Amino acid sequence: MVRLPYPFYEELDNSQKYEVFKYCWNDLDNTIILRKFLEPDIKLRIEMGRNYSADLRSKSDAQIAEVIFARELKWKHGIIADRPTIAPDYMFKYTVPDDVKFETKQLQDVLEVIRAAEFRLSEAGVVQMPDSIKSLNIKIADTIYTMGMGGLHSTESWMHYPEDTEYLIFDRDVASYYPRIILNQGLYPKHLTKHFLTIYNSVVERRLAAKESGDKLTANSLKIVINGSFGKFGSVYSILFSPDLLIQTTISGQLYLLMLIERLHLAGMTIISG
């Protein structure tokens, strides 16, 4: 993209008109390229819009998720979803699940720090990570891990690990990690009642089934709903706003990873990055 070569109010001579002509053609060419690039996303939004009687073409993934959950709650359960009213100084704690347990004293101490931590909302409605958690440097073997709103991160510098006849490197991912945590712990925005969980479970199960059967359109549509809804749990402007759910999910995800890392380490394996 390029800037307009002359002020829009300027009277142009013939040579300047030709420059504007080239500018317009450049705009058109790039618009066509952008349209082709976005075509799958546009088609997906049109199809989803038909299913939910809504024009979703200009909406982000998170906005689409919000519309769909609002529609499902109203159509299936008669619930009119409104934004919750939560005080700016709202404070809450993370609830440690029964299945989170550590073998080493170091990680048991980390768990107690997290159990005691108080989460608060800023005046803008953003969840603040407690300093006691932000300052944690969790050393397992030669790697240091930190916890944050965005997940668990290892702090290694540049490294090179070759695979050879003695060492194998494995890279594993978890399907629908956060959604499974939400479902397994029975989490839901309190103002939307447990009916939210019923709809959420249906979306996750339908998406996995579509992915398994090769139905890409349905799988991609429902992926938008799942991923988009999680982003809205932290937005004070959303009907899905639920700071407790957001923290319960993200902190649980990090603790489960630390449990896995600890067990692999105790079994004699090396964690390259997390």
What are these regions (language model features)?
Residues M1-L4, Y9-A175, R263, T270-G274:
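Conserved "right-hand" nucleotidyltransferase catalytic core of DNA-directed polymerases
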Residues P7-L12, K134-G274:
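Helical catalytic core of nucleic-acid polymerases
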